[in-house]
Amino acid sequence: MQFLRFAAAAAALLGQAAAFPPGFGFPPTQPERDGCVDSETPYIRSYFYVGGGYVDDGSGGHIFRDQMYVEKLLPVHGVSKGTPIVLIHGQAQTGSNFLNKPDGGRGWASHFVRQGYEVYIVDQTFRGRSAWMPGYGASKPSTYSAEIIQQRFTAVKEYNLWPQAVNHTQWPGTGMMGDEVFDAFYSSNVQFINNATYQQKTVQDAGALLLDKIGKPVVLLGHSQGGIMPIIIADARPELTKALILLEPTGPPFQEAIFSNKSSRAYGLTDIPVTYSPEVTDPTTDLVQQTYPAKGENFVQCVLQAEEPAPRQLVNLVDKPILLVTSEASYHAPYDHCTVEFLQQAGCSKTEHLELGEAGIHGNGHMFFMEKNSYQIQKVLRDWIQAL
């Protein structure tokens, strides 16, 4: 009897709740202070896996490998935006990058949910909750030392390894070991498989299945090593891709820069085949390369397709809006324009380059979505998406 009374009371309360304004039952939202708040946006969370399959483990049993973890977040008061957003992290990271920031501030996933979007966050294959089966694709996992993170991401001004590093001001705290925010960030870094071809192929396969499951065109947003994943997923599922946002994607085309100058990415932006017209069967001969002069001081030369023969076209991407975002102080600042030029040369005429410094957003490094002014940047992306 007591249970029935409780159930009736709960039902009545739930019936009343439908008439209450949005936010009822949750703590009031604090002033955003440019996005830095102490609590995340309430959401409905579920998770699932896509891709992968069973393989023989060599001893009479089977294991499951190459699967990708996906976390789905929905606004508690319902989705009000028609385009889902898929968030893809970079090397040595997991999907936690887009949850709350290392300083405790509200992350981009929370902002997108609050703005009414259906959000999907992945852990790339072999990363985080997407388990790697030892021996497949690499003999052992790789890691980034704390020193590398300091030098390239969080305390770049102290090392000054590229000209734009002097502009870095937005990382909260010192960006060095022992600082509370740095320690929170570095403790979230994970091992990774240093095999770009295997990584890209498995993410492409799993990502295509993710888009099939979502069932309608999405915005693919990727960062750094994960920044080229929107390209390869969109190439596999162009009809389910509405737009691509590339946050300082791996680059520049055909070569490394800043920390090395070795040849890389045989297909221009990727290590695996993507769809060109005319078809590329051997990238070493079919993609004729040409070096173009640097656009100015403190920038690198670009290796792009040659002017003759006519540059091959990325036919599955030519009609897609693409936004490439570069921060003012990152090691990408000297070369991201090469990636933009490569895409435009390959027929992607809707490619735009958002250089944050030129847009009046100053002081950011490579992990700008975690930095003090991250909400200011997210609002620019929100406006771009809404204008599609």
Q: Residues of each region from the PLM?
A:
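Fungal secretory targeting signals
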Residues: 1-21
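N-terminal cap/lid segment of alpha/beta-hydrolase-fold proteins
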Residues: 23-80
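Short, surface-exposed "cap/lid" segments of acyl-processing enzymes
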Residues: 77-163, 167
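Conserved acidic catalytic loop of the alpha/beta-hydrolase fold
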Residues: 163, 170-172, 176-219
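Gly/Ala-rich beta-loop-alpha elbow adjacent to hydrolase catalytic centers
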Residues: 221-230
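Conserved alpha/beta-hydrolase "acid-adjacent" motif
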Residues: 229, 331-338
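Short beta-strand/loop motif that positions the catalytic acidic residue
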Residues: 318, 324-326
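Catalytic active-site module of serine/aspartate enzymes centered on a nucleophile-bearing elbow/loop
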Residues: 359-388
